[in-house]
Amino acid sequence: MAVFTSKINRKSDLFNNNKEDFTKLIKKMEDIHLRAEKVSERRRSKFIERGQLTPRERLSKLLDKDEIFIELFNMISFLVDDDNHDTSISGGSIIAGIGFVCGVRCVVFVDDSGINAGALTAKSIDKALGCLDISLKQKLPFIHLVESSGINLMNYTVEFWSNTGGMFYGLAKLSAAGIPTIAVLHGLSTAGGAYQPGMSDYVIGVKKNGMAALAGP
């Protein structure tokens, strides 16, 4: 096998200028990621009032301590629903990634109900399909923390939502392949948000808080 030796001069002006520019871009990206967390955090008082954890607190308590969590697709939806670079929120109202639960590597999918009540955007579906595909190919259990008002009907167009059924098809494929699908229903979930528990192999409902309704309460 041929050996390729780097010829980068780490002391050169070119290298250091590129490093500085790239570091600034990384900081911008991190600020965009943090924006979604800050917007969700504004609803903290409502979560406390309902006796709930915030989405990120719930995720943190689910994951094994001292194990890495690799967040996936966290730039999705940026400049899609809002074309203003300074206000657009990335992530598609979902926190998703790969982490360990009781020592088992899993795909974890969390509805961020602090953002538009967890309503799905057009790109939320793409994020879900990507996570389901990873779960199937890597044979990783799929855990969904469910609290969603379903599709955002205020921005509904057929062409954007035509692949929504792929989410349910993906869950069915995982189940058929013997890969566990687990839904934790911990809040009010309507319409599309209610299908997830119904199609999962295992459902955990939080007493007095978890509720699913196909059309409305």
Question: What would you call each of these model-derived segments?
Answer:
Residues 2-106, 112-117:
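Intrinsically disordered, low-complexity segments enriched in small/flexible residues
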Residues 70, 84-89, 123, 158-162, ...:
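Thiamine diphosphate
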Residues 82-83, 92-95, 127-130, 167, ...:
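Short alpha-helical segments and helix-capping/turn motifs at coil-helix boundaries
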Residues 92-96, 105, 140-141, 168-171, ...:
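Short glycine-rich loop/turn motifs
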Residues 95, 99-112, 127-154:
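A structural preference for short, pocket-lining loop segments at secondary-structure junctions
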Residues 106-109, 118-120, 140-145, 178-189:
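A short, small-residue-rich loop immediately preceding and capping a beta-strand
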Residues 113-135, 201-212, 217:
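Extended active-site and interfacial segments that coordinate phosphate-rich ligands
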Residues 146-217:
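Conserved catalytic cores of soluble enzyme domains
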